[in-house]
């Protein structure tokens, strides 16, 4: 790796910006004062990284992406807030990620994420490691996306909602409540449809683990039990992944998307 950044002569880099070893900055890109870019990151043509943004190592910021813009919040007063991005992310064309609204606040993108073209991440959002946002996903403020979650194209998520770990959301879904971990949510409005078996297998879940999760799913979403009774019976399964579902439900402030009448079994 070249120990010096490679900056195209038409790019604009602020005097106080810090670029790590091997950083590449393409034609007409803009990196404002105070930005930190980790080694090996590539900022392609016409991308903009605005002040108060820190981006880690080995990221690819594609053409026309704008990172760290001011939040679209009528209450924003110009406070110093931040955008923090981890390592090894792919941020494709036209993606917009805004910094936080509240003084001292952060918008956070983890590591190993893939944000496809024209996805939007609003102020105070948190995106966990390995999450994927497909084309035109739109996250309102304060949304929390769990690790390895997959949001298909055109999904819109209401402010303050949470999407659990290894959850999947179908294309063009409208999300106004929390989406359970390990579960496929789909539709307008969103409904829990089934376990995300493909995603779980990719995450290393074996046959025994899947059977236990299917039973937890059945108790929570496909039985006639009262919620508290279902959670108690789920806890009796003694499984840490099921316990994660229980904790997610108990921590919900907006409620969670339940199964629709046409929802399938957990297969």
Question: Predicted segment positions?
Answer:
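Structural signal for interior beta-strand "rungs" in well-ordered beta-sheet cores
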Residues: 6-191
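Terminal amphipathic alpha-helical/low-complexity segments used for targeting or macromolecular assembly
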Residues: 1-10, 15-17, 21-22, 58, ...
